[in-house]
């Protein structure tokens, strides 16, 4: 028999927080949130004391005085400039020291790294009052990592005629995008949730705020499948938001990127965009990485994507993580990852995504010719993007590289993948 669940708004809030705390989160207190800098200062200082006591001493952060205030404003400014993901990944410089704000996920068997990761503080705070101007307005829930906000939530209950659509409207009409917490890059996503569906927005912009579904899909359609053990949406906090999963999103998916756009008059301008994976993208990449790790090389997989489903980012995320995939002996699973496409937009998308990862950008190459492609392969360039037309020219070269292992990501959703060229790639 399906268990009874309190799905009122407050009941859903309590349920999510209870499950997150059971999985290792800390329950934060709304009073620890400093609105002027949009930080949970209590959790931030707890992390710094546990991981970098000398930094705390050098910067005089234990005392509630001018040095601490200067550091908090420095950190707030860096998040404004670089986005929360980059600040978590790379930390900040302040005065004579570098301050780490996050400890990376450990590689298998790395005990020291596992211990360091365990010192991260993932916290969830209920009814967070975020505004100095409208002091009574509160978000249902906010998730922080080491005191830095990463996700906000508005929760609704369909049983009382309040649905995820109402949560979306609340974000669009009642949440001032000028508030520090809601500015672009401050959080990785803002999530509207009820007991049946999840949607998210990466950039709150009033009534034009655009929310995308974050559902599992059901019967080859939208929504979520029935859940005999609880709510349809509990995959969100039981799978996606658990510490290791959210850390993986921060490290390998979410990022603030810069794009060049052209207006109606042909003038180009640069805009910033927060990237966050949709559920099907996350599931696809993780499943392929898992299968590649267990199955080894030499297998084929077909990934079906519909138009507008974010295939370019999915390919880019998969490519950069396949490069880092390790076999049991600790050796790289693949010597190179080759992406085959004839769409310049995809090449641009991959380049932009890859370059956000400093440790990967230097090993990315785009081949303009068969000779360049041959050179990249022989020199061991890790990620190579080429066109379907050029690939057959180096099939003979691959024979000379028989001791190498390659992963091929083939974009097949366009017309040029037909005839002899495609046949050769499918050999």
Residue ranges and their predicted role:
Residues 2-336, 345-361, 379-382, 389, ...:
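ATP-dependent helicase/translocase motor core
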Residues 381-427:
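Conserved RecA-like ASCE ATPase "motif II neighborhood" in helicase/translocase motors
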Residues 139, 335, 369-373, 395-397, ...:
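Short beta-alpha junctions and helix-cap segments that line functional grooves
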Residues 323, 373-378, 398-399:
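Extracellular/periplasmic ectodomains of large secreted or surface enzymes and adhesion receptors
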Residues 341-344, 364-374, 388-393:
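Conserved helicase motor
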Residues 193-194, 341, 410:
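Short beta-strand/turn micro-motifs composed of small residues
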């Amino acid at each position: 028999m399906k268990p009874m669940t309190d799905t009122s708004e407050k009941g859903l809030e309590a349920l999510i927080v209870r499950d997150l705390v059971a999985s290792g989160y800390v329950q934060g207190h709304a009073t620890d949130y400093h609105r002027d800098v949009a930080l949970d200062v209590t959790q931030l200082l707890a992390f710094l004391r546990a991981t970098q006591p000398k930094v705390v001493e050098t910067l005089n952060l234990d005392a509630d005085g001018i040095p601490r205030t200067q550091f908090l404003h420095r950190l707030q400014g860096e998040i404004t400039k670089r986005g929360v993901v980059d600040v978590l990944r790379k930390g900040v410089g302040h005065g004579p020291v570098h301050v780490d704000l996050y400890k990376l996920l450990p590689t298998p068997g790395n005990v020291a790294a596992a211990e360091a990761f365990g010192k991260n503080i993932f916290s969830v705070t209920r009814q967070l009052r975020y505004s100095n101007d409208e002091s009574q307005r509160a978000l249902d829930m906010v998730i922080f990592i080491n005191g830095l906000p990463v996700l906000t939530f508005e929760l609704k209950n369909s049983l009382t005629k309040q649905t995820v659509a109402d949560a979306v409207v609340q974000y669009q009409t009642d949440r001032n995008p000028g508030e520090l917490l809601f500015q672009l890059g401050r959080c990785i996503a803002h999530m509207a949730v009820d007991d049946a569906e999840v949607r998210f927005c990466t950039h709150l912009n009033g009534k034009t705020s655009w929310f995308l579904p974050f559902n599992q899909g059901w019967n080859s359609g939208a929504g979520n499948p029935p859940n005999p053990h609880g709510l349809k949406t509990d995959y969100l906090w039981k799978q996606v938001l658990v510490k290791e999963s959210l850390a993986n999103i921060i490290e390998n998916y979410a990022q603030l990127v810069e794009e060049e756009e052209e207006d109606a008059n042909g003038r180009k301008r640069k805009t910033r965009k927060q990237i966050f994976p949709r559920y099907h993208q996350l599931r696809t990449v993780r499943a392929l990485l898992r299968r590649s790790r267990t199955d080894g090389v030499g297998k084929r997989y077909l990934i079906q994507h519909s138009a507008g489903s974010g295939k370019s980012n999915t390919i880019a995320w998969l490519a950069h993580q396949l490069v880092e995939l390790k076999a049991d002996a600790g050796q790289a699973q693949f010597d190179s990852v080759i992406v085959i496409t004839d769409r310049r937009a995809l090449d641009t998308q991959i380049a932009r995504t890859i370059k956000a990862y400093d440790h990967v950008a230097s090993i990315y190459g785009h081949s303009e010719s068969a000779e360049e492609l041959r050179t990249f392969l022989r020199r061991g360039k890790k990620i190579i993007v080429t066109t379907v037309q050029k690939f057959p020219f180096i099939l003979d070269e691959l024979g000379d590289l028989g001791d190498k292992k390659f992963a091929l990501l083939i974009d097949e959703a366009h017309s040029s993948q037909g005839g002899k060229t495609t046949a050769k790639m499918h050999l």
